[in-house]
């Protein structure tokens, strides 16, 4: 799909159908099903859960071939919206697993209950959690939480794995496929609004 074809679809397509048929279905041209199985096996081993208790979807530019939104880099520069996927681009994975979600949620709940104040200030972690999404970059930074730390250890190791191309791999954890689907639809609606402003 060319960038012009993608923009045309985002302007006119039924976005729920687009999410179901394009984003949540089919393979990524940049991350193979064998590589996905390797990630699944690694997570299952680390967290002592069954592989079939999770699903993994490639999302973002590694699925569509283009990054839909402007992105700020660590240096403060901005990468343009609809930039093509490049060999050095991150691989974004959505991990869908009620079991794994509850394992990490339970650890966060114990941490919150051990805090001296209530409600515990979850920061932006809670803002995303209400959408059924645990964002690892918002895990508590000043607490040693084993299951949360395990997440970073797993994805750090995966990012340096030659079988996965030694490129940055990021994982976001969703409670269900419906939670991921709703988030993707919301993002595409925002993308459509941005495109309409440009026309």
Feature locations, PLM:
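Catalytic core of pol beta-like nucleotidyltransferases
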Residues: 1-89, 96-199
């Amino acid at each position: 799909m060319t960038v012009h074809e993608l923009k045309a679809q985002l302007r006119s397509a039924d976005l729920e159908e687009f999410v179901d048929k394009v984003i949540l279905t089919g393979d990524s041209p940049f991350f193979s099903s064998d590589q996905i199985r390797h990630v699944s096996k690694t997570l299952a081993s680390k967290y002592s859960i069954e592989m079939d208790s999770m699903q993994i979807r490639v999302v973002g530019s590694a699925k569509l071939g283009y990054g839909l939104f402007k992105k700020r880099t660590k240096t403060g520069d901005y990468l343009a919206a609809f930039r093509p996927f490049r060999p050095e681009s991150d691989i974004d994975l959505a991990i869908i697993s009620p079991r794994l979600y509850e394992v990490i949620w339970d650890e966060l709940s114990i941490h919150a209950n051990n805090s001296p104040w209530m409600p515990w200030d979850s920061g932006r972690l809670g803002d995303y959690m209400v959408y059924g999404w645990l964002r690892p970059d918002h895990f508590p930074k000043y607490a040693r939480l084993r299951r949360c730390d395990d997440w970073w250890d797993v994805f750090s190791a995966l990012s340096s794995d030659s079988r996965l191309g030694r490129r940055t791999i990021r994982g976001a954890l969703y409670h269900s496929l419906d939670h991921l689907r709703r988030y993707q639809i919301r993002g595409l609606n925002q993308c459509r609004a941005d495109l309409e402003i440009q026309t």
